[in-house]
Amino acid sequence: SLIVNKSSPKILKTSNLSHYQMIRQFVETLHRWGKATYIGFNSIDFDEEFLRSTLFKTLEYPYLTSTSGNTRGDLLGLARAANLYYPKTLKNPISEKGNAIYKLDQIAPLNGIEHGDAHSAIGDVVATVGIAKIIYKNASNVWKASQLTTDKNQTLEIIKKELYFCTNEYF
């Protein structure tokens, strides 16, 4: 992480905040921002789990991103669904087995998104926003449908009301 973000161990020693203080500032910032939809690339299975674990360890409420009017989504699943329903929404590299690859650092450049250092915080944000814009533009129905299912209760209402609905999972 230090290498990817071009930092040094020295910055860890000279930080003005403890881990707990940093997380407190983070939580206070989220509260100050108010209700939001949090979307990342592969964020549900990685970032959200890491965040919840960190919040729990610091005695903070671990479900900040999915309660009190906040919702969350994952652009990885959305990218896969967009290409399923609107083929060629995104350009993907192909694996040796002939499968589309959905790694952010590989699909971003193929789709004209120059995002600097892959896996750096700002680089991944730039790439994620770029991919989101492409999906919004080229597969707007998939984008709109995904926004209806970022909240558990709203999703349950859709399931109860609709005669048919579709969900996509990838393994």
Model-derived regions, located:
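Generic hydrophobic alpha-helical segments
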Residues: M22-L30
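Short linear motifs at secondary-structure transitions and domain/linker junctions
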Residues: K13-N16, E48-R52, K161
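Metal-dependent phosphoesterase core characteristic of DEDDh/y 3'-5' exonuclease domains
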Residues: S1-P9, T29-V142, S146
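Acidic two-metal-ion nuclease catalytic site recognized across multiple nuclease folds
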Residues: K133-F171
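Metal-dependent phosphoesterase signature
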Residues: V4-I23
